[in-house]
Amino acid sequence: MVDPAPEHPYPDGHRPDEAPAPHALLEPVLGLLGSWYGRGEGGYPTLTGDFGYAQELTFSHDGRPFLRYEARAWLLDADDAPLRPSARECGWWRLQPDGRVEALITQPTGIAEIMVGRATGNTIDLSTHEVALAPTAKKVNATRRRYTLTDDDTLTFHHDLEAVGQPMQHHLSARLRRRG
Amino acid sequence: MVDPAPEHPYPDGHRPDEAPAPHALLEPVLGLLGSWYGRGEGGYPTLTGDFGYAQELTFSHDGRPFLRYEARAWLLDADDAPLRPSARECGWWRLQPDGRVEALITQPTGIAEIMVGRATGNTIDLSTHEVALAPTAKKVNATRRRYTLTDDDTLTFHHDLEAVGQPMQHHLSARLRRRG
């Protein structure tokens, strides 16, 4: 027999003008709040050829000075039809009083990454502070990420990767639109 | 102007008998799938007194050999009323062919932890493999966790912590019921 349970008393907000009021430190990243959907391309020397993918991103908050972050991608075939589930990420973006961002991002591939950076205007640049790897994870040394709000409803994303013996180089780029 | 976007083509399953079919490696942890709600107590020498909290846990999967994990807690006052949002966690539990579990768990407090362990019968024991800390995070050295399905609809949770100069010791324990 299962129990009915109360609704969570502190649901996340997904818009700056929605309860709960965003923490003041979130000001530089308020434009990210919400859900995003779009397309991207990726490649890496150790992968067999480039690939196209679709992606959902969600940023929310609960009134404290961090964003909840989740990303889900799926590969697309030559006809742009879904092929299979692909990269997933979740974590937290902590905003510091001096405007720095500390992003904790984990992936089911066994990678837990702590990135640091800053939100400058409409761009957030992040680079690796520390990477922790699960015992069976592939070797990832470092990554660089750039998120840019090119307008209120368009988010571009570029991701460079240094892994599996390869130097830092382009891995993914995507253009996402705010979901209605 | 925002775009309507297609539904995600690979939604997570929250029950063993629901699509998508769970990966065979998830067999030892199928009992965790779903949402859980319950109460817990916590304390630590560096905290001012013990505390009561309520917690939601969610385990889901997308057909691959890992669970998506999310936990949200909120503190309760002396009258058992919600006081404020508290600990949050998200991450992934990777199941290995030999039955080992690799759990990646991040917290908005700036902690990214990789734990390893095993599911034995109805109990999953995890201990720290590696901890990565955000530059401004408090110092956490290691943790130990035990999740036990005492019956199909009841999950107990014990969490020991070695942090901020204190030796490994009890930190949290909770009893959760499956949400209807």
Swiss-Prot record, chains A, B:
Domain of life: Bacteria
UniProt-annotated stretches for the region Disordered: 1-21
Cofactor(s) in the UniProt record: heme b
Keywords assigned by UniProt, alphabetized: Heme, Iron, Isomerase, Metal-binding
SUPFAM superfamilies for the chain: Lipocalins (SSF50814)
UniProt keyword Heme present: yes
Gene Ontology terms for molecular function: heme binding; metal ion binding; peroxynitrite isomerase activity
Protein name as it appears in the record: Peroxynitrite isomerase
Binding site for heme b: H171
Lineage per the UniProt record: Bacteria, Bacillati, Actinomycetota, Actinomycetes, Kitasatosporales
Basic and acidic residues bias: start-end ranges: 1-20
